[in-house]
Amino acid sequence: MCCNYYGNSCGYGCGYGSGYGSGYGCGSGSGYGCGYGSGYGCGYGSGYGCGSGSGYGCGYGSGYGCGYGSGYGCGYGSGYGCGYGSGYGCGYGSGYGCGYGSGYGCGYGSGYGCGYGSGYGSGYGSGYGSGCGCGYGSYYRSGCCGYGPSCYRRCYSCC
């Protein structure tokens, strides 16, 4: 499945992909990643992630970002980005990007893209997504959503 599991808030990307990249990574997108979006990730969105949303939620924090916590949640931080943490959450960072972390989370970086990480996370890279992931844009790619009104409250499968 791509996009998210609740049919809403695709964010700047969707699916298992990452912001400007691909894979189980992170950045400005949704899915297992983090940043601005939804899914198992964090940032602004809903689902198992945290930030301004619901689900397995996060710890202490404010704004669209995540708070301090671990496990399915996010680490310490604020804004659209993720904070410091581990496990399914995100690492340390701010902005639309992801912070430093490992596992299902993201690596170190900022902006719309992804940072440096390991495990199911993504490495350092940018560009318009590929594979199951989507890139930043007002169109659909690989059966997923880009950023745009038509993206919200829809779900797609591309894996």
Curated annotation (Swiss-Prot):
Tissue: Expressed in skin during two hair growth cycles. Expression restricted to the cortical cells of hair follicles, appearing first in the cortical cells processing the flat nuclei located a few cells above the dermal papilla.
Positions of region (66 X 2 AA repeats of G-[YCGS]): 11-147
Recorded superkingdom: Eukaryota
Gene Ontology, cellular component aspect: intermediate filament
UniProt entry keywords in alphabetical sequence: Keratin, Repeat
Keyword Membrane: no
Repeat found in the keyword field: yes
Quaternary organization: Interacts with hair keratins.
Function: In the hair cortex, hair keratin intermediate filaments are embedded in an interfilamentous matrix, consisting of hair keratin-associated proteins (KRTAP), which are essential for the formation of a rigid and resistant hair shaft through their extensive disulfide bond cross-linking with abundant cysteine residues of hair keratins. The matrix proteins include the high-sulfur and high-glycine-tyrosine keratins.
Family listed: Belongs to the KRTAP type 6 family.
Record-given protein name: Keratin-associated protein 6-2
Organism: Mus musculus
Upper classification of the organism: Eukaryota, Metazoa, Chordata, Craniata, Vertebrata
